[in-house]
Amino acid sequence: DLLKAFRRTIKDAPLPAPLSAKLDAMHQSFPSGTTPRCRSSANNEDLVGFTGAGLYDSYTHRADEGHIGTSIKQVWASLWDLRALNERDFYRIDHMTAAMGVLVHPNFDDELVNGVALTRNIYYPDFEGYFINAQIGENLVTNPDGAEIAEEVLVLQTINENSPYPYETIYVRRSSLVPDGGTVLSHIDLMTLVSLLQRIQGHFQQRYDRADDPSFAMDVEFKVDSNRQLTIKQARPWLR
């Protein structure tokens, strides 16, 4: 199997000394006891007409696995999994333009919630809002197993002048993993997330010189851990 052999070559290849030193310094910069997660982030994900969701592999780097480059090379090698190759072929994506980046962040064990959010009102684009998908624990949002359904929430800027809250929420769909009438995200978590989404949107609008572009939006991934700490894991421009 040529692909399997190629992946093995990538995993076994020694890292250049300067890169190895920088990766080790990055690893050591995490607080003591932190288990890092090496997350795939390819340049051919979330393209127009091609999401690439779930094609590539991410790895948790455990304390007994030595240099973090071991796990990073595993992520790089996943660019050449058979399924990924076939998907790129089908969508006519040039393999020679494909590249794999790795996002390293603390691993989240015992997650209470995971989710993705868009800094855009996808139902009424001319009206400010945020579209949020969330699910209990580590259950997948983008590629759910079986018949699981994620929570879908639209958060809108309120037009009720007498409302004590700046936003109102519309539950488009309820999670199949919570009791009837329950929610995945608490109201406090939801409002905290919206505040962070506002900051992310404003930052990247300036960063990409898109402050005057009403179509610009960010695709954001978040987690709520066992201590109820909400953390942003990843943010990138949304491609329609």
What are these language model-derived features?
Residues D1-L103, G202-Q205, A217-D219, S226:
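N-terminal beta-alpha lobe that positions the nucleotide/phosphoryl donor
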Residues P18, H67-Q74, A99, F127, ...:
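Generic recognition of stable, solvent-exposed alpha-helical segments in well-folded globular domains
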Residues R37-I68, N107-A150, A217-R240:
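Conserved phosphate/anionic-ligand binding catalytic regions in large, soluble enzymes, centered on
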Residues A84, D209, L239-R240:
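Short linear functional motifs in flexible/disordered or boundary regions
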Residues D94, G101-N121, T169-S176, D180-L185:
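Amphipathic, soluble alpha/beta structural segments
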Residues A98, D109, D212-P214:
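Solvent-exposed loop and beta-edge segments used for protein-protein assembly and interaction
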Residues G129-D219, K223-D225:
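Conserved catalytic alpha/beta cores of large enzymes that bind or transform nucleotide phosphates
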